[in-house]
Amino acid sequence: MFGGQTIIPIDRMEPPFWVTDYSLQQRYFSIFHITSETTPGYVQALHKFAPSHLIGYPSILAVLAYHILELGLPAPALKVIICNSEQVLEHQRKLMVEAFKCPVIETYGMAEITAAASECTAGTLHTWPEAGILEVYHPEEAVYVNEKGIEGDFVMTGLLNPDMPLIRYRNGDRGSLPDWEARCECGRSLPRFGSIQGRTKDLILTADGRKLYILDSIFNGLPIVEAQLIQESLSSFVVKLVPLDHTGSSLAELDAK
């Protein structure tokens, strides 16, 4: 699994860059340490664990696939790669298929499970109606959209969590309503997902060519309200912070960091 969890210290410079949950037979790989130099270790760990499939962010798995192809490494035999959290771009799919020699399946979902969809063998995203009710809100007009093809903010009501139901929850994604009438050549009658714009993820590019994602982990544990990281060049960054208070304790802790 290649997700956004910080599973090992960010400043670790030597493998292992992964941890294993033997009770669930799952291995979690750090996405923050993937480089051309560390990729052989990742591939060796994958071969040793011998998974049937990979789950992770397509942007990360595409970088891993690129390095595998760049170095001419033999990838492990997989049945499928399941991508989540981001849309799968065509160049990412091509890289993963070429490197791992297996199908790539796109999914849509979130930890709150207020909506979900998965890609069928025909390449169509089908929604899972049992996960929740998906609506589209047009913020400029301040109305809910009832027509197919009109994009707006996703508004979701989850149906799977009776303990903490989320009602008309806006998760920040945008797109259009599912199509309940269209039929897919795969034979499934589940509605076809409308367009998904999704959210974009920021990254920084280092001087040695690495791409670093999930930048919010940099600010974990700091006494701040919000933060902004601006990259001006490969070696120059501007960090803007709003402390919890301006009286002394928060400022002193930030100065110490």
Report each predicted region and the residues it spans.
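Conserved AMP-binding loop of ANL adenylate-forming enzymes
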Residues: 1-20, 29-33
